[in-house]
Amino acid sequence: MTLAIALFTYYVFSILQLTRKDLLTGLLNRQAFYADIRNNPEDITALVSLDMNGLKAINDSEGHAAGDEALSTLALCFMRALRRGQSGYRIGGDEFAIICRRCSREETDQLVERIRNYVAETPYSCSVGYSCAGEEPRETDDLLRESDAMMYAEKARYYESSGRDRRKD
């Protein structure tokens, strides 16, 4: 009986873990992101927003399998960059996020630098924005809004410098 309960518990836990994973990238998914933001929000010291540049162009010119490969490659870059207290998520499409718990500003800066370095080793690029709580606890909605704004500003600079029309990308 004890073995049956242990096996049942293991299978239930395994199924629950699958519901939190993005099957393409292996990162946690959007559902897990919002659940984790609600779980001990006072421990969240920074949020990082990431968005792949040019995914639509890859999908249109090389096919969706190539786009999936690009997303998986970027996800591996993000996973390599993560350290203790940092969790990576695929929010959907070409959008990603990282929650940093009990990480200093310096650790968050180092995370973003590692991401930029790892992505630079690939043929792809992404726009990154982040927001740190600082000394005083802040609402996660504010952190998310600020990191998204920073990421979208970087994305706009990417499109301006590349001369590409972001509406087609």
Model feature map: region roles:
Residues 60, 100-103, 133-134:
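Residue-level recognition of strand-loop junctions within catalytic nucleotide-signaling folds
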Residues 105, 109-116, 127, 132-169:
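Catalytic-core segments of nucleotide cyclases and related cyclic-nucleotide turnover enzymes
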Residues 80-85, 111-125:
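Short catalytic/binding micro-motifs of nucleotide second-messenger systems
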Residues 87-90:
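A short pre-motif secondary-structure segment
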Residues 15-35, 50-64, 69-72:
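Conserved nucleotide-binding and Mg2+-coordinating catalytic segments in signaling enzymes
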Residues 55, 74, 96, 128:
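Hydrophobic framework residues that shape the active-site pocket
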Residues 66-85:
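Active-site-proximal alpha-helical element of nucleotidyl cyclase-like catalytic domains
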Residues 1-24, 31-45:
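Signal-transducing coiled-coil linker helices
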